[in-house]
From Swiss-Prot:
Main localization (coarse): plastid
Sequence motif DEAD box, residues: 190-193
Chain ranges for the short sequence motif Q motif as given in the UniProt record: 41-69
Recorded family membership: Belongs to the DEAD box helicase family.
Name of protein: DEAD-box ATP-dependent RNA helicase 58, chloroplastic
Species: Oryza sativa subsp. japonica (Rice)
Length: 438
């Protein structure tokens, strides 16, 4: 199921301003394309360079996903677009194909920016972009503050066609006049709701959207699995001049944001019992690979000198877990090299990754069969993104599960998540299922 809305939407203020709606002609064109197109090549219809399409086919991108079928006609026409579809649906490939269709491979200038909220997501986007580019153009990653001085000289000497950057690194380079955005044709903001929801990043993002370049001179693409109050967001995009007035909202699967094949479970236990319950779950489930999500350490806890919960969980599992999976740590306070090492180590083999929510956005670890919420997510959207790390292609047909550990007082919060995201959560009877004495 897919829904399309132009910026005109139901808002009367938008209609009065004379903004163009997403017309019937566009809808019919998309329907015809969906009915007839069998391959990604046919969807792209000659608007993506041949060498990029060939490379995409070589690595397995042959049949388009639903979001690619629905969005590529809009993206490849050069229109501003809000890509709104669940995690693992193919948004990254969709916007990268649009980027490659827009840039001039023979020109030495920055022509496309992809802005990401985390370095890990940036690493993944950069990898896909470089695979597709196949050395036909330069793709530079600005993801680590410690490397920016060296990269500043590189980007001045030979400007890359595409830059993938975190908000902070990008703003730092722009303010140092490391490169010009005069030639920029495409601006992509990935996980846009996450960046707008981050007090550390939102002001810098607004600068990127309005101060450093103008919406009228570029194609703007927003991507996310979750955009709360999306009609309002579309209106704000136009009102604040983040996009042009004919921005198109492509919303795939709006009714069922949670992948339907996932099993959701929960166990009620005290916080003191939580580590042992987690251990018993791991022994019982025997996951192929798993991610254990733990809450960020509070400032109060830091000031008190307490170790982060991630460290506590990792140390506990390394001394008690007897399974074959390697226990690894990933958290925001780790330096770039340590985080990159952890991310590289989990690729292609069995693992238990203990992480904060940094791993919930854009992480592509398809072998993940089990998610464990050691701490309850703050919002339903956070639950959705954590759950989206499992059940991904080509493993989506496997029995994948999300298990949340909660106290009695947190039960109502989990029920609220179920109502909002429309999924059912089965209770695990802790006392009868686990062998240890609680």
């Amino acid at each position: 199921m897919a829904a399309f809305s132009g910026c005109a939407s139901p808002l009367s203020t938008t209609l009065r301003s004379g903004l163009a709606p997403f017309t019937l002609r566009h809808r019919l064109r998309l329907r015809r394309l969906r009915a007839s197109a069998a391959t990604l090549r046919e969807v792209c219809a000659g608007r993506v360079p041949e060498h990029v399409l060939q490379r995409a086919e070589e690595v397995g991108y042959v049949v388009p996903t639903e979001v690619q079928e629905q969005s590529l006609p809009v993206l490849l026409s050069g229109q501003d677009c809000i890509l709104h579809a669940q995690t693992g649906s193919g948004k990254t490939l969709a916007y990268l194909l649009s980027v490659f269709s827009a840039i001039d491979f023979g020109r030495s200038s920055v022509q496309a920016l992809v802005v990401v909220p985390t370095r890990e997501l940036g690493m993944q986007v950069t990898k896909v972009a470089r695979i597709l580019a196949a050395k036909a153009c330069t793709v530079m990653a600005l993801l680590d503050g410690g490397m920016l001085r060296r990269q500043k000289s590189w980007v001045k000497a030979e400007p890359p066609a595409i830059i993938v950057a975190t908000v902070a690194s990008l703003c730092q380079m722009i303010e140092k006049r490391a490169f010009s955005l005069q030639s920029m044709r495409v601006l992509v903001i990935d996980e846009v709701d996450f960046i707008f929801g981050s007090s550390k990043q939102v002001s810098s993002l607004r600068k990127i959207l309005t101060s450093y370049s103008a919406a009228s001179s570029r194609q703007t693409i927003f991507a996310s699995a979750s955009i709360p109050q999306h009609n309002r967001f579309v209106h704000d995009c136009v009102q604040h001049k983040w996009t042009k007035t004919d921005v198109v909202h492509v919303h795939v699967n709006p009714v069922q944001p949670m992948p339907s094949h996932l099993q959701h479970k929960y166990a009620i236990c005290s916080k003191k019992e939580r580590l042992h319950v987690l251990l018993s779950l791991l022994e019982k489930d025997a996951p192929k690979s798993g991610i254990i999500f733990v809450a960020e350490q509070s400032e109060k806890s830091k000031k008190a000198g307490h170790p982060p919960s991630t460290t506590v969980v990792v140390e506990f599992l390394r001394t008690t877990y007897m399974g074959s999976l390697e226990v690894l740590l990933l958290e925001e306070d780790m330096n770039f090299n340590a985080r990159a090492t952890s991310f590289t180590e989990v690729k292609g083999k069995g693992f238990l990754l203990v992480s904060t929510d940094i791993a919930s956005r854009g992480f592509d670890l398809p072998q993940t069969s089990h998610i464990y919420n050691f701490d309850l997510p703050k919002t339903a959207i956070d639950y959705l993104h954590r759950a989206g790390r499992t059940g991904r292609e080509p493993f989506s047909k496997l029995a994948c599960s999300v298990t949340t550990l909660i106290t009695e007082d947190e039960h109502f919060v989990l029920q609220r998540f179920q109502n909002e995201l429309k999924f059912h959560c089965e209770e695990l009877p802790v006392e009868s299922m686990f062998a240890f004495n609680l």
